Structure formats: structure tokens, C-alpha cells
């Protein structure tokens, strides 16, 4: 699990210096953080309990240092591998070694290694078999006295045996064959030159165009990609979702995607001055070789690089969107410990009903049929509410959710019992998971799913950590991005959120415990086993009795674990056990006990923090301690507020232009936000419709789970599209052109909420086009 101890090698001084410059930090901040990471400290622990050591670095900065150090380590490992390969083949010289040691990126290393990389048989190697390397060297020198034709004539008739496995003797037949072979040797030399590659790379990075076109004969089959049938735009400005959309079309053999220069001759002109040094016959041969090298070897190599580079950038953008959305969902306000009746709506098989106690324990389950056995369903639900003293009702927002909600509201329950629609994304995946089978081995999938819906209302964080984050449905193109990078980012997000909230050690599941700083799946399971065997923990100190939870793990975890009702009230706070003596001294100096100090704000106000500053404990930690004493174990999540959709609006057909409706943001992407207005398919608020002012990043305006008011701009039932706006005066019914906004929605009961892709923005060379069907991405965004 990502939250376990993170061991790194001791920091390299050169890496520390360079990283301090890159991140604009002081050297001691990077060095201290790197040292803590090397000793096994976690990101949450370092940022929360080692502020004096790091100079107040936050989680983002600590994680950046960790990730960059890993990248630098990977570069060093590749450097060592290259040096070993060159030494083994006796190709290493002092100048080359110095250049390799000075290379700071993998790209620079690979450019240096390119001429020496073992390669397959090429046109240049064939020319060398013909004995033409001396001719290539002669031409490359560009001596005015050199006559290329005469020099080539000397090689005509040269006998050689091609290394093609056939071993049939051959000869150089003509002068042109000799010159062509010499140019091939020069061309390969040019293509492997680090300066040539660097120059052309810069040209591609600044001017390259990404384009796509439909494969001939696939026009009908590829209809979902028709926005990209004939598309081009500057690569440097291409948004991540468009890059990923084109790549997906290519992977599905619908599109051809290219990254090219607007003018290939510009690439040749950039490289040519490095090699063409004279205007004479020999120089002309070199010029021809450079042009060939650029078009045949360098440009394809740069295209491959740019494709990978743009994919990496697009992945990073998409992963950030996913992680940001996930954080908001995990931080969603919890209902808290209340008795809940949870309902998983269904028509054919009925609505599965479960009753949960205040700790989320399953007490009872049943099935009701509001659509065809309304009287019986009403009697059952009313009986459940009364018998189990229900304090809230949770209803899944899937098919039949609004109808079920209307039925429950019609029961006339007390106003003190909120009826809440709960996002059920991922509930079905949880119900079939090993975690669910372990929790409820004697119940079927429908019961497990309903329990998950109820618990998600009570404590979203505790329930969502049981799911694979990718199944929650708040990303864009999550199946197209680098899966290891995605997992790392999402794990970091879960770890950050779990530790930011804190975990009650006596009630937390092993899944939740496994994300606590310093713990892992094995230790978490041992904590639960010890809890089941000997009863609730009475203090944090008792955690040391848990198998495999040693002093280091205790140091990293203790501050994030809460023991409610412990003898020492500090055990229920975020004050780390290592700081207990400080609190005890503060209390003693005021003639108080620790509990008295925690209760009496007027006494705490008298504490002079400077008095307690030591070599290891400074004002940042002391300030945190006093703040925690005021609200021990406080939950940083917002207070729960019930939300209701508009009555009478249950399906897309109920929507009318100009309607103003309450909605819940379900997904935020780079191009806008998807909003649930209670009609079983989400509408899109395009980035241009999020506010009256310009919005660059949708995430700066809206977050998943946020309650918003929207205006219905357009409803296209045949195309399953709903366009919404958050502007104060939206233009109703406007056919929003490229970049202005595109409605998107669920394509049916099984389609995920959100995750669509708008058509690309119009490039200057194309006329405006009408919106096309873009809902396909919503369906593609999850595996079928």
C-alpha cells in the first residue's frame, strides 16, 4: 500500500543542489527532506510533524522532492548502464565520459549514446560493408580539391560480401551507387549527432503540428471520432483531452495521427549549418546527405519523441484532473454516525433496502416494489423507519433513483429525517469485490451494494477507500493514461486525504487503516485482528502490541490515529505522542491537568509559546499543538447539508430551455463540468459557461460534489445531450460552436456520469463547424 514506509537511498549532494534550484527552495530544505525520506519517513508525517526540519514545506513540495529524486535516480541508473556498455565494447573515451556524466536528462543521455547504440542492419551499415566509409569521410571533409565523382570511381568494382545471411559476393557497380552509399553513411552520422537532434527537437517543440485524419473506408465505423476526421492544430497548444482523443482513435484503427513540421524544409535549414561548411562539389554531397538525414531519419525520430512527450504531458494533465476530483469526493461532508435506511433502486428486481446502525453495521435487508406493490412497499418502509429508529434515508442515484426518491418523500417522513440521493458510482464494483465478500460472505451482491450506498452517506472517505479509485468515475481518459503514474497519484491523494482527516483506530476498516502513514495492508490487518481478539484499544501506546508495528511505524502512524475515549485525551487528537511532554509541561506551568488545559480556552491563551521552543521543537509545531488542543481530533471536512433535486424533473423530457435547476457537480474535466440535475444523465457546463468571466481551469470554479444552480441551455433528446450554463444571462438554445461548449450526457443506464470530450477548438485554417455527437467518450471512458 502506498502509505507504508517509503525507503530511499541516501541523498546525492549533486541532486540536492540541482533540486533546490529547480524548486526554488533552500538547499537545507531539500537536503533535510531527502534525508527524512531516506530514513523511511512518509510525506504526510514529514509535512505535519517535521516542519522545523523542512522549513515548513507542505505535502505538495515534499512529494515533489520525493518524485524528482526518484527521477534523478533513474537517470543515474541509465547513466551507469550506458557507461558499462561503452566500457565493455571499448568505446569510452575521456571526452565522451565527461559528456555523459554531465547529462542531466534521459534525452541528453540517449542523444549521446545514439552513435554507439547496437543497431540493426541499416543503409549506412550496408554502405560500410561496401567499403565506402573512407569515401564518406573524404566527402564530409568538404575539401575544395575533392572531386566526388573521381573519388567514387575509385570504389567502383570493389568486391564485398553482404552480411545479409546469403553470403553472395557482390561489387560496387556504379559511381552513383558509391556516392549514394557514402551519403547514407553521412546521413546516419548526422542523425546521431546530439547537436542536430537538439536543434531539430527545439523546432518541433515550438512549431510542430498535431493532425489526424480518418482511415479510408472507416468513415461510418469511426463516426464517434468525426471531429478528428480532418484535424490539425499546434502541438504546443493542443489540450490534453484532444491529444488523448486522437490517440484513442488511432489505437482503435479509426484515425491516423501525425506530428509534423508545418514546413519540412525549415527542419533541414536548422540542421544544415551544423554540417555543410563549403559551397563545392563535396559540400553539395554533404548537403544532400543532411537533407536525407533530416527527412528520413531525424524527423521520424522527432515525431516519435513528440508523440511520447505530448502523451506524457496529456497524461499528467488528465491524472491531475482525476486526482483533484478524487480529493474532493474523499473530502465530501459525512452525515456522521446515524441510523440509515439505504435503498438501491431497481425496477425488475425491486428496490433492495438495508438498515444500518450508527456504526454502519447491517441490521436487516429486504426488497420492496414501489412500482407494482406500492401499498406493501409503503407499509414496509414506514415500519423500518419506526422500528430501526432511522435518522436518514440514502437512495442510489442510478436508474429509478428519482422515482424511488419521490416515493419515499411521499411517505411523509418527519422533516428531521433527510432523504438524500447518493452517487452510487463504483458501488456495483465494490459489491463484487473481495473486500465486500469478506465483509458480507452470506449476502448477495445487491445487499452489499445497498450497504455501500448507505455507508457512503455516513462517511464517504471510509467507504470510498474500499474501491479502486478508477471505478469512481471522476476522471477523463483514465484507461488511456500511464496506469502506474495514475495509481501513484491516486494513492498519494487517498493517503493525503486519509491522514488529513485522521482515523479512529477502534472502528476503522483495515482498508482505511492501510492508508495511514507508516502502515500497510499487513499491519492494518494485524491491528484489526488485535482489536477483535482483545477489544478496543485504550491508548495509542497499545498499538505497539500489534505484530509488525514497530517503533518506526508507530512514529509515522501515531499522530494520525485517534483513540476516542482514551484515558489520555491527547490520544484522540492530532498531537503526536512525542509532543505529549510539551503539553504536560504547559498544563503544569499553569497549575492544570491536561484535560483542564484542553477545556479552558482562557488558560490556553496565556501560554507563551516562545517559552517552550527547543532545538527540536519550534513555533510551527507549538502553534499546531495549541490549535489542536482547542479542537482535539477535529474533522476538517465540511458539515453535512442535505440536497434535493427539483421536484417534477425526473427525466430528460422534463427539461425545458431556460429552466433554472439545482444540481450536483459529478465530474470536472479540462473542458468543463458535468452536472447531475436528477434526470439520469448528466449535462455539460462547458468551460465557457461556468462563469460570466473567463475561466482557464474549470477546477478553479467548481469541484465534484459541489451544489450549483444551472440554467438549461439546450436539450437534444435524439443525441442524448444536455447543455447547461452557470452564467447569469446564458444564451438559450444557441448552437455553441467549437470552443463555446458542447453538451454531453449519459448515453444510457450503463454509461458513466461525466467523462465526455468536446469537439476540438477551431483552427484558423478551418471554417466553423456545427457540433457533432461527442457523447461517445462518456461511454468509452470506462471499460465495458
Report the location of each language-model feature.
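Long, charge-rich intrinsically disordered scaffolds of nucleic-acid metabolism proteins
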Residues: 108, 112, 420, 426, ...
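Single-stranded RNA-binding regions, centering on S1/OB-family and related RNA-binding modules
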Residues: 561-784
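C-terminal accessory/binding modules appended to enzymatic or scaffolding proteins
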Residues: 24-25, 333-335, 495-529, 647-685, ...
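A glycine-rich phosphate-binding loop feature that marks nucleotide/adenosyl-phosphate handling sites
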Residues: 202-209, 343-347, 399-403, 422-429, ...
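Accessory alpha-helical DNA-binding modules that contact the DNA backbone or grooves
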Residues: 42-43, 54, 58-165, 169, ...
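Duplex nucleic acid-engaging cores and interfaces of nucleic-acid transaction enzymes
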Residues: 45, 58-64, 71-342, 346-443, ...
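Long, charged amphipathic helices and adjacent flexible linkers at domain junctions
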Residues: 305-323, 436, 471-504, 609-657
Amino acid at each position: 500500500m502506498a502509505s507504508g514506509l517509503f525507503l530511499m537511498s541516501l541523498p546525492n549532494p549533486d541532486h540536492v543542489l540541482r533540486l533546490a534550484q529547480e524548486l526554488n527552495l533552500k538547499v537545507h530544505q531539500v537536503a533535510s527532506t531527502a534525508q527524512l525520506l531516506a530514513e523511511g519517513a512518509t510525506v504526510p508525517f514529514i509535512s505535519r510533524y517535521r516542519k522545523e526540519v523542512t522549513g515548513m514545506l507542505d505535502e505538495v513540495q515534499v512529494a515533489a522532492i520525493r518524485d524528482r529524486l526518484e527521477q534523478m535516480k533513474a537517470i543515474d541508473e541509465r547513466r551507469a548502464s550506458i557507461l558499462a556498455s561503452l566500457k565493455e565494447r571499448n568505446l569510452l573515451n575521456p571526452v565522451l565520459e565527461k559528456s555523459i556524466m554531465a547529462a542531466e536528462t534521459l534525452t541528453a543521455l540517449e542523444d549521446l549514446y545514439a552513435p554507439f547504440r547496437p543497431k540493426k542492419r541499416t543503409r549506412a551499415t550496408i554502405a560500410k560493408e561496401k567499403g565506402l566509409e573512407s569515401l564518406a569521410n573524404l566527402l564530409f571533409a568538404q575539401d575544395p580539391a575533392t572531386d566526388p565523382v573521381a573519388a567514387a570511381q575509385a570504389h567502383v568494382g570493389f568486391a564485398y560480401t553482404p552480411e545479409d545471411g546469403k553470403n553472395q559476393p557482390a561489387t560496387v557497380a556504379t559511381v552513383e551507387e558509391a556516392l549514394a552509399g557514402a551519403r547514407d553513411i553521412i546521413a546516419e552520422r548526422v542523425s546521431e549527432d546530439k547537436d542536430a537532434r537538439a536543434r531539430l527537437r527545439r523546432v518541433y517543440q515550438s512549431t510542430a503540428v498535431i493532425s489526424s485524419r480518418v482511415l479510408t473506408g472507416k468513415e461510418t465505423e469511426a463516426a464517434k471520432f468525426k471531429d478528428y476526421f480532418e484535424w490539425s492544430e499546434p502541438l504546443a497548444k493542443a489540450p490534453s483531452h484532444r491529444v488523448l482523443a486522437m490517440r484513442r482513435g488511432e489505437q482503435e484503427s479509426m484515425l491516423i495521427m501525425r506530428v509534423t513540421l508545418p514546413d519540412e524544409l525549415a527542419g533541414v535549414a536548422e540542421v544544415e549549418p551544423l554540417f555543410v561548411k563549403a559551397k563545392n562539389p563535396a559540400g553539395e554531397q554533404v548537403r544532400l546527405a543532411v537533407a536525407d538525414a533530416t527527412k528520413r531519419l531525424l524527423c521520424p525520430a522527432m515525431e516519435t519523441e513528440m508523440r511520447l512527450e505530448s502523451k506524457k504531458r496529456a497524461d499528467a494533465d488528465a491524472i491531475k484532473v482525476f486526482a483533484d476530483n478524487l480529493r474532493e469526493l474523499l473530502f465530501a461532508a459525512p452525515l456522521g454516525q446515524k441510523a440509515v435506511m439505504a435503498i438501491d433502486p431497481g425496477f425488475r428486481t425491486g428496490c433492495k433496502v438495508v438498515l444500518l446502525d450508527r456504526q454502519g453495521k447491517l441490521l436487516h435487508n429486504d426488497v420492496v416494489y414501489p412500482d407494482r406493490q406500492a401499498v406493501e412497499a409503503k407499509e414496509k418502509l414506514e415500519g423500518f423507519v419506526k422500528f430501526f429508529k432511522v435518522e436518514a434515508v440514502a437512495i442510489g442515484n442510478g436508474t429509478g433513483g428519482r422515482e424511488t426518491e419521490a416515493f419515499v418523500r411521499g411517505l411523509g417522513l418527519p422533516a428531521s429525517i433527510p432523504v438524500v440521493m447518493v452517487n452510487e458510482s463504483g458501488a456495483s464494483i465494490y459489491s463484487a469485490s473481495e473486500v465486500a465478500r469478506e465483509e458480507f460472505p452470506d449476502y448477495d451482491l445487491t445487499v452489499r451494494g445497498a450497504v455501500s450506498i448507505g455507508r457512503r452517506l455516513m462517511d464517504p472517505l471510509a467507504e470510498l477507500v474500499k474501491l479502486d479509485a478508477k471505478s469512481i468515475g471522476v476522471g477523463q481518459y483514465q484507461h488511456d493514461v500511464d496506469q502506474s503514474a495514475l495509481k501513484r497519484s491516486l494513492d498519494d491523494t487517498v493517503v493525503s486525504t486519509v491522514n488529513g482527516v485522521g482515523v479512529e483506530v477502534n472502528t476503522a476498516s483495515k482498508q482505511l487503516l492501510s492508508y495511514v502513514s507508516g502502515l500497510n495492508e499487513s499491519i492494518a490487518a494485524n491491528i484489526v485482528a488485535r482489536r477483535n481478539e482483545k477489544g478496543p484499544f485504550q491508548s495509542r501506546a497499545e498499538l505497539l502490541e500489534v505484530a509488525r508495528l514497530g517503533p518506526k511505524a508507530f512514529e509515522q502512524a501515531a499522530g494520525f490515529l485517534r483513540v476516542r475515549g482514551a484515558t489520555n485525551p491527547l490520544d484522540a487528537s492530532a498531537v503526536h505522542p512525542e509532543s505529549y511532554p510539551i503539553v504536560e509541561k504547559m498544563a503544569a506551568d499553569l497549575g492544570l491537568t491536561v484535560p483542564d488545559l484542553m477545556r479552558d480556552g482562557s488558560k490556553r491563551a496565556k501560554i507563551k509559546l516562545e517559552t517552550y521552543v527547543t532545538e527540536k521543537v519550534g513555533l510551527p509545531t507549538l502553534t499546531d499543538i495549541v490549535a489542536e488542543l482547542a479542537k482535539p481530533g477535529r474533522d476538517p471536512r465540511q458539515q453535512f447539508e442535505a440536497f434535493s433535486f427539483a421536484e417534477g424533473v425526473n427525466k430528460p423530457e422534463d427539461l425545458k430551455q431556460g429552466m433554472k435547476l439545482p444540481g450536483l457537480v459529478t465530474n470536472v474535466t479540462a473542458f468543463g463540468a458535468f452536472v447531475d440535475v436528477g434526470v439520469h444523465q448528466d449535462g455539460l457546463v462547458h468551460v465557457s459557461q461556468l462563469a460570466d468571466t473567463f475561466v482557464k481551469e474549470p477546477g478553479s470554479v467548481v469541484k465534484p460534489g459541489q451544489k450549483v444552480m444551472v440554467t438549461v441551455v439546450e436539450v437534444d433528446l435524439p443525441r442524448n445531450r444536455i447543455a447547461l450554463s452557470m452564467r447569469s444571462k446564458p444564451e438559450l438554445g444557441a448552437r455553441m460552436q467549437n470552443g463555446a461548449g458542447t453538451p454531453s450526457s449519459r448515453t444510457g443506464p450503463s454509461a458513466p456520469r461525466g467523462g465526455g470530450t468536446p469537439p476540438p477548438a477551431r483552427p484558423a485554417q478551418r471554417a466553423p463547424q456545427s457540433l457533432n455527437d461527442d457523447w461517445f467518450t462518456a461511454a468509452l471512458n470506462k471499460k465495458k
